[in-house]
Amino acid sequence: NQLALADCEFVLKLLPSQCTKQNVQDAISCAKDCSLVVALGGASICDIAKIVATTLDLDFILIPSMPSNFGYFTLDSFCQEENVYKKIRTNQAYKILVDENIISKADRKQVINGQKLVLSLYEALFSCQFDNLFYNNKRDLTNLKLQLCKFKDNYEYLQSDTDDSKLVLMDILIELAKATEDMDSINVFDFAFCLKTKSNLPFGTLCLLASKILANLYKQTFEIKNIYKFSLPNFDVIDQNLSSLNINKKSVNFTPLKSMFDNSVYKKINAIKNQCLALCENLENQLSNFSLPADKSELQLDDVCKVMNIAPLVYSCSPLVNMIYGIGLLNIC
């Protein structure tokens, strides 16, 4: 009504609650003659709006409908295409409007489910970051840890279903969003584990097979590839950050190797190798109920590539793909 009174022409589009390639294309066709995109809804609506506005180079305003939505405060969106979730970098929103009336009226059951999901996602994110010695992204892990503790400490209060508790939840999520830009990756990874590729093998099984194959290729690759210092992170800085957080580095062997590579480069490579082997072990424990094919040759290369591409987390946090990226097996744009 306010838009009509202001003599604004507008297109009202009710979008499906899933960010798929087709839904995005439909939304783009509706918005191609518009000068502004305004999105009111949950995470999927937010993702669609961000992709549409970025594609058409339009300003956009986001209005979250749930206090547990965190996609509004990041620059990434995730769009499902067939069996793959693609991570799309989007423009910054012109405005993010948190309406207290909308947030306070959010459904209690959905809010609690959202809280549980967010808590598990951030715990997984924090765990991934300090377990992965090859993680080369400057983030304030201490702030992330503090915000996570704050979330836990206030968890019971946040379930009280009061207007104030929902607003407190939104404030905490905004702080969590500031602590890291890639928490949506954990969400996508969680979904990806439920998907199956065309080979009908569970995603986790493909991860395990891929990690085993890559671990076996490690020695051969190390011998034939030129390793350049600029392609590796500052391991000393990472080591200092981990030490300040009392991180357990038991899976990494720091024994120097007398070879053509200097000690600092070798320590980096050795850490990557051991993280890859540790990932294999972790996956084996997690997938103990799966029966793996006896003949590893049955695994097709394109299926392994699907494993690498299906979850953005594999690129942003996984020691497995960081390992093969660091030694030149995989080029990531």
Segments and roles (model prediction):
Residues 44-51, 69-72, 186-190:
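Short glycine/serine/threonine-rich phosphate/pyrophosphate-binding segments
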